[in-house]
Each structure stands twice: as structure tokens, then as C-alpha cells.
């Protein structure tokens, strides 16, 4: 079953509908390019806005909301949204929806239970992000959180036997160096620091969040290889587990305080903005990510770091010194280099070899006249088929 916004047949389209295959090449190319730009904007805004909104909501004067309740509310809203989308896919037929959910969730309970582990980790990760962002500037968190690329790569090598290119290993080393510089600047930076913030706790939380993100993402990919479930079904199943596990975490960590002050204690429009961003932002990204290749996603991450830094200067009085600029620059460069597909590196190497050969003698591999140029290398990797299943709203991609 095709997910809404995730492709599918055009057979149900009206007589005036135009299929992608009937478009002129130039029109189709322009439409695809426009979709890529829209995807880039969505990825950048979602990446930066969630972190900035959490930081803003957690540093406002007055009563502070319970982060565990925000995590639960985001899971509830995400699950309800996916349920409505599945209802729309069944053309509003309640009976068909009930039969479908009974088959997909209860009858195939083994597949459903497989999602309990990543859902538990994602729920823990969401709570850790609140702890981290509450104890370090948004820009510092955005840079440090890119360690999830390192942890994901390491878990991919260990759990999926995936190999990395030399360029990717070099970019991971560059990434770690950049994060270390930023954290050194954070630890030794001058200036007043709010008394209720603990940079050490923030760093521990973000490192734990990156470890959980890397493991959960790779584990999720491993168990869903060959799965036929749609984006919305998988996110609904994750939402069910996430809500239940989030309530357990709420009871364990802040149960007494929530019982005394109320579930929605400290909720303001800013807090609701955070909850809605977590719930709906990732679902939106799950739709547009099919138009974004690795390079575009790496570029979006780099732009979101820049946007978070600029916004932090304006909103929170964040000071950018040369050490932070150096570390952030290394991280941005590392993210971009890591996102380059292997074919690009090989193409660059072959281009360099051809250039050197042309200086020493005639080229023996010239393109014959009248023949079309060779096809361009694809920037998609083979393991991207499971990425739309990832709950982007909670991963701050």
C-alpha cells in the first residue's frame, strides 16, 4: 500500500490529470528541481526551528513545563495524525480501516513488537534532547548533535557490515575534531552563564542522545529491511509504543510533580509550538525526504547550523568567537563531505586522472561524435529506502 505523498499509482487521477511520464523533459526537470528546493527549505526550517523553539520554551521566565509531558503529547498527536491519514487512504471507511489495523497491528504482532525497541530508544532520546538543550546554547547543541553521524556510521559498520570510504572516515575524524573544539570553547568560554544550566549535564545528554540515535536508526533499518508497511502505519505503531513508554517515563521521573500540578502545567503557546513541531514536522519531512538526496540533506544540515547560530545571536545573545566558528566550520565541512556518494569521489578521481593524462599525451577515451554522453552518477545510496520510515519529528534531522 502506497503512503500518502510517497508515490503510488496515478490510475485514480481524473481525466485531466497529467502523469509524470507525459511531461516534457524540461518541464519534468524544472518540477523536480523545484521539489528539491522545497525539500531543502523544509529540512532546514524543521532542523533549526525545533531546536530553537525548545531552547526558547525552556528558557522563558515563569513556570517551566514538564518535558516528559511534551514528549507524550507529541507522540499522541503524531499517532492521531497517522491514523487520520490511514483513514483517508481507506476512503473514510471505518470498517476497512479497522480490519486493516487488526491485520497489520494485531495479527502481524511480531512485526509490531519489533518496533518496541526503537520506540523505547526514540522516547529516551526525546527526553535527553530536552535535557541537553536546556543546559547548552541552541547553536552549540546543533553542532554537537552532529555526532549522531559518527555513531550511526559506527553502528552501521558493526551491525550491518557496511563499509565506509576513506573520504567518509576522514570526514568523521573531521567531525569529531570540530565538535571537540566547540565543546572546548563551551567549557572554557567566558561570560556569564545562567545558574540553572549545567554544561556538563548538557554534554552528557547530547552524547547519550547521539548514541541512542545511531543505534536506533541502524536497528530500525535492519528490522524493516523488506517490510511492506507504509510510512503512516510504521509511524502509527511507533506512536502507540512511544505514548505508552512516554507515560511510563513520565510516571517514573516526574509522576509526583505532574499529579500535584497537572499534566499541562507551564504550557504556553511557545510550548504548544514545540509539541506541534515535534509531532508534525517530522511527518512532513518523511514526505519530502524522497526528493532529497544525500548531498541535499547534508547541505540542509549545514544550513540549519548556520541558521541556528544566527538566530541564537538574535534571540539569546549568543556570542560567536573564532574558536566556535572554527569548530562549526569543520563540522559543516565534515557533514558535506560525508554526504557525498562514493561515485562522486570516484568520478573526481577519474576526472583528475584524465586531466593528467591529457597533459602527457592524447586522450584515448574520447566520446565518439554523435553519441549521447554517459549517464550521470546517482547521488542516492542503496540504503535510503528505509529512511522515510524514520520518525523525523523526534530525530531533529
Curated annotation (Swiss-Prot):
Q: Which GO terms describe its cellular component?
A: Golgi membrane
Keyword annotations for this protein, in alphabetical order, are:
Antiport, Golgi apparatus, Membrane, Sugar transport, Transmembrane, Transmembrane helix, Transport
Could you tell me what this protein is called? UDP-galactose translocator
Q: Which GO terms describe its molecular function?
A: antiporter activity; UDP-galactose transmembrane transporter activity
The species is: Canis lupus familiaris
Share an example GO biological-process annotation for this protein.
UDP-galactose transmembrane transport
- Chain segments annotated as transmembrane: 3-23, 37-57, 65-85, 97-117, 140-160, 169-189, 200-220, 238-258, 269-289, 315-335
- Similarity comment: Belongs to the nucleotide-sugar transporter family. SLC35A subfamily.
Q: Where is the composition biased (Low complexity)?
A: 9-21
InterPro entries linked to this entry: Nuc_sug_transpt
The protein's job, in short, is:
Transports uridine diphosphate galactose (UDP-galactose) from the cytosol into the Golgi apparatus, functioning as an antiporter that exchanges UDP-galactose for UMP. It is also able to exchange UDP-galactose for AMP and CMP, and to transport UDP-N-acetylgalactosamine (UDP-GalNAc) and other nucleotide sugars. As a provider of UDP-galactose to galactosyltransferases present in the Golgi apparatus, it is necessary for globotriaosylceramide/globoside (Gb3Cer) synthesis from lactosylceramide.
Q: Where is this region: Disordered?
A: 1-21, 355-397
Q: Which SUPFAM superfamilies match?
A: Multidrug resistance efflux transporter EmrE
Subunit relationships: Interacts with SLC35A3; the interaction is reduced in the presence of SLC35A4. Found in a complex with SLC35A3 and SLC35A4.
What taxonomic lineage is listed for the species of origin?
Eukaryota, Metazoa, Chordata, Craniata, Vertebrata
The reaction(s) catalysed by this protein are: UMP(out) + UDP-alpha-D-galactose(in) = UMP(in) + UDP-alpha-D-galactose(out); UDP-N-acetyl-alpha-D-galactosamine(in) + UMP(out) = UDP-N-acetyl-alpha-D-galactosamine(out) + UMP(in); UMP(out) + UDP-alpha-D-glucose(in) = UMP(in) + UDP-alpha-D-glucose(out); UMP(out) + UDP-N-acetyl-alpha-D-glucosamine(in) = UMP(in) + UDP-N-acetyl-alpha-D-glucosamine(out)
Protein's membrane topology = Multi-pass membrane protein
Amino acid at each position: 500500500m502506497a503512503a500518502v505523498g510517497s508515490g503510488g499509482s496515478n490510475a485514480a487521477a481524473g481525466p485531466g490529470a497529467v502523469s509524470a511520464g507525459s511531461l516534457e523533459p524540461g518541464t519534468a526537470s524544472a518540477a523536480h528541481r523545484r521539489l528539491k528546493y522545497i525539500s531543502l527549505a523544509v529540512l532546514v526550517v524543521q532542523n533549526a526551528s525545533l531546536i530553537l523553539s525548545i531552547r526558547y520554551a525552556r528558557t522563558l521566565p515563569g513556570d517551566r513545563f514538564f518535558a516528559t509531558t511534551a514528549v507524550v503529547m507529541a507522540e499522541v498527536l503524531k499517532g492521531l495524525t497517522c491514523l487520520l491519514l490511514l483513514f483517508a487512504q481507506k476512503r473514510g471507511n471505518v470498517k476497512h480501516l479497522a480490519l486493516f489495523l487488526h491485520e497489520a497491528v494485531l495479527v502481524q504482532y511480531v512485526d509490531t513488537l519489533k518496533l518496541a525497541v526503537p520506540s523505547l530508544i526514540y522516547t529516551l532520546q526525546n527526553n535527553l534532547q530536552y535535557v541537553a538543550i536546556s543546559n547548552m546554547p541552541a547553536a552549540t547543541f546543533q553542532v554537537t548533535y552532529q555526532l549522531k553521524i559518527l555513531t550511526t556510521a559506527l553502528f552501521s559498520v558493526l551491525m550491518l557490515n557496511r563499509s565506509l570510504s576513506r573520504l567518509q572516515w576522514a570526514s568523521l575524524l573531521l567531525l569529531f575534531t570540530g565538535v571537540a573544539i566547540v565543546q572546548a570553547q563551551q567549557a572554557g568560554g567566558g561570560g556569564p552563564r545562567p545558574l540553572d544550566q549545567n554544561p556538563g549535564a548538557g554534554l552528557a545528554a547530547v552524547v547519550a542522545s547521539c548514541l541512542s540515535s545511531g543505534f536506533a536508526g541502524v536497528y530500525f533499518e535492519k528490522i524493516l529491511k523488506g517490510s511492506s508497511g507504509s510510512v503512516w502505519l510504521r509511524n502509527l505503531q511507533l506512536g502507540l509504543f512511544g505514548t505508552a513508554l512516554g507515560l511510563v517515563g513520565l510516571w517514573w521521573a516526574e509522576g509526583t510533580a505532574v499529579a500535584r500540578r497537572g499534566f499541562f502545567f507551564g504550557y504556553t503557546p511557545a510550548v504548544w509550538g514545540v509539541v506541534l513541531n515535534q509531532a508534525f514536522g517530522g511527518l512532513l519531512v518523511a514526505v519530502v525526504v524522497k526528493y532529497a538526496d544525500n548531498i541535499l540533506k547534508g547541505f540542509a544540515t549545514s544550513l540549519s547550523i548556520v541558521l541556528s547560530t544566527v538566530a541564537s545571536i538574535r534571540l539569546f545573545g549568543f556570542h560567536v568567537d573564532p574558536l566556535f566558528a572554527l569548530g562549526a566550520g569543520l563540522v559543516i565541512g565534515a557533514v558535506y563531505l560525508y554526504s557525498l556518494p562514493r561515485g562522486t569521489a570516484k568520478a573526481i578521481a577519474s576526472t583528475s586522472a584524465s586531466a593528467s593524462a591529457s597533459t602527457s599525451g592524447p586522450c584515448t577515451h574520447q566520446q565518439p561524435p554523435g553519441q549521447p554522453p554517459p549517464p550521470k552518477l546517482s547521488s542516492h545510496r542503496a540504503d535510503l529506502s528505509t529512511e522515510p520510515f524514520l520518525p523525523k519529528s523526534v530525530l531533529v534531522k
